[in-house]
A protein has these predicted regions:
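Membrane-embedded alpha-helical bundles of multi-pass transporters/translocases
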Residues: 2-488
């Protein structure tokens, strides 16, 4: 049977299609297979390594100082790099980061609970720095690639949706299956009553090593199969080329309303959802006494995102990204309010009420999740529209920095709050007082509501690229680029 001829676009590239979407999804699956374990870091060091809440909270803040240096510098380095690589610039950086994730992911979960406080602190900081640097090396160029795969707004929205799908798939193993194998039931030896659950730290280490290896496989699939249709070496070199200025780029980012709005929404999402992970694990182990179900419950809560997948392009075409995502944030607000009820109802109703609130939250967040990365791609175009430079790597890396800052500061605050309500690390999850257990329930509910509020403010009030403005921006940018090509 004759092979179907390869269809090419007007520039000679393979036409955009399903292979691009699957490959791009595989990239975020790779990122999340390893870094999806981040939600387990605090639980591992708090419950298994028995690190004091105050010390762990401080260490989490310290490693964010590394983020402050790490993200923008790597983004600027990629923007300024004009060397020619066999795989291409972005794919080469992604490959290096993918290798580093195998080592770094395991390093942060070295199981030495008997070590002294100083050694524990050193192990935590070194392991986390290696892991975080590798993630940034892979994730910054990966995120920037969305605007290089296609220039079509609808196709970018599809890529953003598939990225979210890849992220969800990649997060399922560490987020859902891992809790089922790393917790063990603890019973009273005299009465046989179930007291709660304890963490099996050795299994976390081997799981992290395995996740890093699987992530590498996903990254290699993406590197080999995706096609970049926009020149990744678009920043010209030579005497007439504008010099790259990190300070100016940061100033432009702050003045870039779409980038700021999308970043605030993302920070809110991570401050709520990611921060809730530690309190959620402790709550499920101590309150519901079913920690192995925590990941499964989270999956059920966020499955509604998949409802929007087949319709996201139609929703975007009809209403616009901002308009559709804003409506979703209102539904998330309702879910957050419902979740405030579960600590007040009888135990028999607590889990169902929690689930209703979580499903509403996930349903509302579904649209935003599907288009969030396409919105950042639009923000990069906005940077070019308003300031004359795209600066993909820097805009994306600053967005990534603030996201990761939220991921780091949030858990640090949550751990400090757990200490404030009386959590005693040496008692694990089985010996905490009832006040601490109920306090963790209120903490989880409050974090989800806070997350929904931030998403509404970021997308509904700050992000200013509605459907009409986006069309105007795209038209003007296309005219500029056409004029520049004629001038050359």
């Amino acid at each position: 049977m004759a092979k179907k001829p390869l269809q090419l676009d007007e520039k000679g590239h393979r036409k955009f299609g399903m292979l691009d979407k699957l490959a791009y999804a595989a990239g975020d699956a790779g990122c999340n297979l390893s870094f999806g374990l981040k939600g387990t870091v605090q639980t591992f060091w708090l419950v298994y390594m028995m690190m004091e809440t105050g010390l762990l909270s401080i260490l989490l803040l310290i490693v964010q100082a590394w983020d402050a240096i790490n993200d923008p510098i790597i983004g600027a380095m990629i923007d300024a790099d004009q060397r020619k690589y066999k795989m291409g610039k972005f794919k080469t950086y992604i490959f290096i980061g993918a290798v580093g994730l195998i080592v770094g992911g395991a390093a942060v979960f070295l199981p030495f609970p008997g070590a002294g406080p100083v050694l524990k602190a050193v192990l935590f900081i070194l392991g986390y720095i290696i892991w975080d640097a590798a993630y940034t090396m892979a994730n910054v160029p990966y995120g920037s690639m969305l605007s290089l795969v296609t220039e079509d707004a609808g196709e970018r929205a599809q890529l953003s949706t598939w990225r979210s799908v890849g992220g969800m798939v990649g997060g399922m193993l560490p987020g859902i299956i891992l809790p089922m194998i790393i917790w063990k039931d603890v019973f009273d030896p005299e009465t046989g009553e179930k007291l709660g659950q304890d963490l099996l730290g050795d299994r976390v280490f081997w799981a992290a090593l395995l996740m890093g290896g699987l992530a590498f496989v996903f990254f290699m699939f993406m590197i080999k199969k995706i096609t970049l249709r926009v020149d990744e070496y678009s920043v010209k070199t030579g005497e007439d080329a504008p010099k790259f200025n990190v300070v100016r780029a940061f100033g432009n980012f702050i003045k870039n309303r779409p980038a700021v709005g999308a970043t605030i929404a993302a920070m809110g999402m991570f401050l709520g959802m990611q921060s809730a992970t530690t309190a959620n694990s402790i709550m499920f182990a101590a309150y519901f006494k079913q920690a192995q179900l925590s990941g499964l419950v989270m999956m059920v809560g966020f499955l509604p995102m998949f409802i929007f997948m087949p319709f996201i392009k139609k929703l975007v075409d009809k209403f616009g990204k901002k308009e559709a995502a804003t409506a979703g944030t209102v539904v998330s607000l309702v879910g957050g309010l419902v979740m405030l009820l579960f600590p007040m109802v009888p135990m028999s109703l607590a889990l169902p009420v929690y689930m209703v609130g979580l499903i509403l939250f996930g349903l509302g967040m579904g649209v935003y999740t599907c288009v969030s990365w396409a919105m950042m791609s639009d923000a990069i175009d906005y940077n070019e529209w308003k300031f004359g430079t795209r600066e993909e790597g820097t805009v994306y890396s600053l967005h990534s920095f603030f996201r990761k800052l939220a991921q780091g500061i949030g858990p640090s605050i949550v751990i400090a709050l757990l200490g404030a309500i009386g959590y005693v690390e040496k008692l694990g999850t089985t010996g905490q007082s009832q006040e601490v257990v109920i306090g963790s329930c209120w903490l989880v509910a409050g974090l989800y509501l806070f997350s929904a509020v931030c998403q509404f403010v970021g997308i509904g009030l700050i992000f200013n690229l509605d459907k009409k403005t986006l069309a105007k921006m795209t038209e003007e940018l296309n005219a500029r680029r056409a004029a520049a090509e004629i001038a050359e």
